Amino acid sequence: MSNSPVSPIQAVIFDWAGTIVDFGSFAPTSIFVEAFKTEYDFDLTLEEAREPMGLGKWDHIQAVGRIPSVNARWVERFGQPMDTQDIDKIYQTFMPLQKAKVADHAAPIPHALEVVQGLKDKNIKIGSCSGYPRQVMDILVTAASDYGYQPDCVVATDDLPQGGRPAPFMALKNVIDLGVSNVRACIKVDDAAPGIDEGHNAGMWTVGLLLSGNEAGLTLQEYLDADEATMQAGRDKARAKLEKSNPHYLIDTIADFPEVVADIERRLLEGERP
């Protein structure tokens, strides 16, 4: 019989890249750049590749093509905007590249494993979902497991016919599979706006990550070496993007999450809802 305290929080649903693993969310970003270059000899900047992060990968490619700077160069080069056939070709190039390299970016973000274990010790279930498709997720899940990260549920962006973010379906699939009885007892944690929107749309508490993810775009070494001015610049850049989604909380990295959990527990016990 466990003596662990019972938390009013039933589950936390984490994103993957930039949230729990892959500091800076570099695995998908660098592969988008490579896929555009390989298929069409088209140069994409890392900044452009990052812009719509959090969407499913086909939708992400489509969204990149609609960025004004990308669209202008594409039309100048090919005479017309990117169409569905172009997106399909880039996606088909993206998939094997991503599958080949995603395991290289499976290392947990500092303190992620301890934070997750702390949640499990309180009998809080660990859900997860991602903009990665299932065939990429299966590789990443295995690689992350080798590091010690084993969530109770994994939902990929193409698992559900209804689609992925910013709609709530992946988060709600976690709710069903984990046996959660009330969505307001769930927290959605993400480093990108579509994932925060997903949490809101599912009726959950939402937490955005400023420094470990896509928006700040720092490598782990850059983060570890950063002075306060660099850190603040990263925070400001990420906050400008994430605040538009009105997350309930914004923190630097997963290391700061236990304080948020304690505050949400207090608010739930006082009768608040997201």
Residue ranges and their predicted role:
Residues 5-113, 117-122, 138:
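N-terminal helical cap/lid subdomain that shapes the substrate entry/recognition surface
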Residues 105, 129, 163:
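Glycine- and other small-residue-rich loops at beta-strand/loop junctions that grip anionic moieties
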Residues 19, 130-132:
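Conserved phosphate-coupling serine/threonine residues in phosphotransfer and NTP-handling enzymes
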Residues 2-10, 113-118, 133-135, 139-274:
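Asp-based, Mg2+/Mn2+-dependent phosphohydrolase catalytic module
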